[in-house]
Structures are given as C-alpha cells and as structure tokens.
Amino acid sequence: MTVLHSVDFFPSCNASVAIEPRLPQADFPEHHHDFHEIVIVEHGTGIHVFNGQPYTITGGTVCFVRDHDRHLYEHTDNLCLTNVLYRSPDRFQFLAGLNQLLPQELDGQYPSHWRVNHSVLQQVRQLVAQMEQQEGENDLPSTASREILFMQLLLLLRKSSLQENLENSASRLNLLLAWLEDHFADEVNWDAVADQFSLSLRTLHRQLKQQTGLTPQRYLNRLRLMKARHLLRHSEASVTDIAYRCGFSDSNHFSTLFRREFNWSPRDIRQGRDGFLQ
C-alpha cells in the first residue's frame, strides 16, 4: 500500500497546515499518510473507499481522514478536491483542544463524511484561499494567522454540520443524499421522498441534477451499482444475492445495468479482470 509522507507535502518542518489542490483528482489506489487531512469536494463525482467502505462523493462533501485511515478514489468524473493537510490535532503551535471540533469515533463508528451546502462551501473556499496565500511565510505572525484560519474552518464545518436542517432546499437536498447512502437498497418512491424532505419533485430533480450531474433515478442506480461492485470484490455472496441486497429485484436487469455502467460484467469484477487498484 502506498504511504504518503508529510515531508513531501508540507512547505517546511515547522508548518502545521498545508493546502494540496487536486484539480482534478484522478483515480488513485489505496493509500494512507503520516498526517491528517480534510478533503473538500469542490465539484464532480466519484467513489471514496474509506477503510474498505464505499461512499459516493459530490460537490459539498467533506471527508475527515486520520493518519491511520486508508482510502482510495475510483470512478471519478471531473472530481475536483482541495485537501487541507495537518500533522496532528496536537501539533499546532498556537492552538490546543482542536480534537474536540473534529468528528469523534463512537462504538467503532467514525462519522468521516459530512456535507455542506453551496453557501458554506463558498465560505470554506475563501478560508482555504487565505491559508494558501500565506504558505510561503514562516514567521510567527503568519504561522499564527494560518492556524487561526484553520480553527475558523473547523468551526464553520462543525457549525454547518450541527445546524444542517430543513431551513432551505439546499440543506434538505444534502439530508436527502445522506439518507440515500443509508437506504439505497430500499424501494424508493421519489414523490414520497420529496415529501419527506419538504421538496417539490421538480426542485428535487433540478437540484440533484445540478449537484451530481445525474437524474435522481440515475444517481440511485449508480449508488446501488457502486455498493454492489464493492460487495463483489469484498464478499463471497452470489451475484443474485448481491443484486437483491443492493435494491435490484431482477438479477438479469442488474447485470445489464452493471455492464453498462462499468463496461465489465459482475462476474468479471468478481474474478478481478478489471485490474482493480489495490
């Protein structure tokens, strides 16, 4: 497995924060690093396999990656990221207690993937741009300024996560996307889902297409197919069982959609013929 080292990314041995844009981020094999990072998805789509679990990521997704987590990117489509790297929550010169603002693992569950709406994403970009502008400056005031900006970034992300509610359609769409990640195998009635998240069906279609580039049903099918591909690679369940577990009532229809999406059959994936990045 590839290991990325801080010496290759931080501008100096004293720097506590570094900005690493990926515009775009291509498919990248499983790796980990000796530093932590906050991955901010600007736009595009892709699959983020995080500690073996696949997540669909789109504009507004924020991922918190620790130094012992392993992850990879695959099936990327114009995926543009900005990575905010930091050595460790306790390696800041002017800040203490940052760990309390980061996601906390509880009973083995780590909430690694958050979502923010477009207005918050714009504020995030501004903070990151300010940090990036100061990267070449190593004096104490500049170091303190970068660390304060990092603190502001964490506060903004945490506040927007805690306050993500039904006050506007962008927030409701983010909640809907998070709901689909957990309920992708359910029979989805889009009229009922639109009502559940207080969206008109037209607004749901328009905003989801704007954010993901896909219609709601196309997005759901891709999500199901991604989950199925993960199970084909990492479980012994039969193709038919996997199809049903991922929300497909007809295994033949599943195989047709699968080949159309990936240009490989489920059997090809099971046998590793696609040359999956390890």
Swiss-Prot record:
Single annotated GO MF: DNA-binding transcription factor activity
UniProt main location, coarse: cytoplasm
Organism domain of life: Bacteria
Keywords tagged on the record: Activator, Cytoplasm, DNA-binding, Repeat, Rhamnose metabolism, Transcription, Transcription regulation
GO annotation, biological process: positive regulation of DNA-templated transcription; rhamnose metabolic process
Annotated region of DNA binding: 191-212, 239-262
Pfam families documented for this protein: AraC_binding, HTH_18
Compartments (UniProt record): Cytoplasm
Function (record text): Activates expression of the rhaBAD and rhaT operons.
Protein name: HTH-type transcriptional activator RhaS
Organism: Shigella flexneri
